[in-house]
Amino acid sequence: MTSSVINVLNKIKDLDIFEDDLYFVGGTALSYFIKHRVSEDIDIVSPKILKYKNIIPIMQDLGAKKIEDENTFSLRLAGMFPDEYILKFILDDVKIEFFCANRPIQKELLKQIQFTTYDNSRLKILDLKQIAKLKVIAFFQRDKIRDLFDFGAILENKIVSFQDILQISKELKNISSE
């Protein structure tokens, strides 16, 4: 993690919003555990619709600037209210993204939440294995080099088994094992 990310985490870690079902995940959370790369953003997931009416004013009171997500238009076309599913902010040059787990495999994974707290604060960080599984899902669903790098670190550190990876792949691709 960069010093900027650490400073922003220190600013947000005890906010009241983290009393809700919000969990620190993503490459920075993975890096927190295994120190495999420098990460410059903060991802927060919720298994539920985001409580945007709470999150937005609290983040703005800290000086965070809300930015639009590139999927906003698509969400509106689908009849959804974007702020319930994704919120992005910039605070001290660090991107903070809150998102609702909307894929069935993500929702299923988040039903068995195991977490610890970040630096003994209100900010909950998913356990390493759950973070790794969410990163494997991201790896299979988008084309970002950092996901490939994280996937390699997950394999190298034996965080999830080959069977877990195969199962995730099957669920995402809707492949039968028969």
Region roles according to the model:
Residues 1-178:
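Compositionally biased terminal segments of proteins
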